[in-house]
Amino acid sequence: MTEFIPLGTLYHALPSPFQMKRGGVLHQAHVAYETWGALAADRSNAVLIVTGLSPNAHAAANQANPEPGWWEAMVGPGKPIDTARWFVVCVNSLGSCKGSTGPASVNPATGALYRLTFPDLSIEDVADAAADVVRALGIAQLACLIGNSMGGMTALALLLRHPGIARSHINISGSAQALPFSIAIRSLQREAIRLDPHWNGGHYDDTRYPESGMRMARKLGVITYRSALEWDGRFGRVRLDSEQSEDDPFGLEFQVESYLEGHARRFVRFFDPNCYLYLSRSMDWFDLAEYVDDKPAADMGIDSPGADALPAAKSETGVSTASTVLAGLARIRIARALAIGANTDILFPVQQQEQIADGLRAGDADARFIGLDSPQGHDAFLVDFARFGPAVRDFLQGC
């Protein structure tokens, strides 16, 4: 098991013990982060980015690490998230293998890797850890909180559990709860990893590594990150050249198969399998409707003035419904918000971003929804900067 930590990573020590939502406790845990730009004297220009499942904190090149980051086109001087104006912080998720404490880290109590002894991880834990970084930097209130994909979930949890932490919010291809389709896909990804004999109940190493399981999990993910429209336009039914195709009668034959294989092989050794399992499951568990019931907000760890005045909206069976999710979102207090998505996203359908805007608006936010006609599905925010960039830039100019 390996941690994959970029050059220039900064660390924040979490409170010890760090209490987790599902009952676990971490001791001597830390969170990795990076920064760009300069913090204003009154600390009013801070922007926090919380990420999807796999990215590290290196969103863009900076003085400590000049290598391009995973959101290079979006973060930097003169870019949509303009570091000439904003002090930008990007936090690596708790539970990851990119610098923050997770299953691939050493348990200080035993001196051995956590592996599957790592406590149950929730999106709320990821949010609480990120909030602690903000407080440690002396930032009373963020100018804007930006979350994409899983980070959209993290951002909503952060806003709900830490009222007043941000003046505005951009939610990009995020959701207020995991839908059955995305849960089903992630369950298959986890099953592929766990069925690999080299996974060995989480006890693998570099020589006996669940490469086949990770490769299959990544292929399933990539299929859902893009859209059928893009697959058709990019690959069609084009076959590999004879020298590229395999002798195996059921081997790679089409270009799209080769693309998936190459993408998967590049990923499998750069993300820890156990971390993948934990973060994946945390997304399935997330549901803002949990915060709408007969309990006072204080009993749920929420210090939100007026949150208890909102009506309960659980169905008679206790199963969350669209109205419960909206009621959960309406408990969030934020001045301005923007929810953006791609109309071709099948993993976090654009209706979920529209729901976020509707729910935040019900909580008196000036909230706007934008559905973009990008062919690139869920991953559009990582590649379709011509569409996503202007929307983010325009919103931040009003902050």
UniProtKB/Swiss-Prot annotation:
Task: List the catalysed reactions.
Answer: succinyl-CoA + L-serine = O-succinyl-L-serine + CoA
Q: Using the record's annotation, list all stretches that form the AB hydrolase-1 domain.
A: 45-384
Q: Where does substrate bind?
A: 218, 379
Please name the pathway: Amino-acid biosynthesis; L-cysteine biosynthesis; L-cysteine from L-serine: step 1/2
Which residue stretches belong to region Important for substrate specificity?
52-55
Q: Which InterPro entries match?
A: AB_hydrolase_1, AB_hydrolase_fold, HAT_MetX-like
Q: Where is the signal peptide?
A: none
What cellular component terms from Gene Ontology apply here?
cytoplasm
Query: What residues form the catalytic site here?
Result: 149 (nucleophile), 345, 378
- Asked if the record carries the keyword Mitochondrion, the reply is no
Q: Does the keyword Oxidoreductase apply?
A: no
Q: EC number(s)?
A: 2.3.1.-
Q: Name one GO molecular function term.
A: L-serine O-succinyltransferase activity
Give the EC class as a word: transferase
Protein function: Transfers a succinyl group from succinyl-CoA to L-serine, forming succinyl-L-serine.
Quaternary state and interactors: Homodimer.
Sorted alphabetically, which PANTHER family does this protein's record hold? HOMOSERINE O-ACETYLTRANSFERASE
Protein name per its UniProtKB record: Serine O-succinyltransferase
Give the source lineage, highest ranks first.
Bacteria, Pseudomonadati, Pseudomonadota, Gammaproteobacteria, Lysobacterales
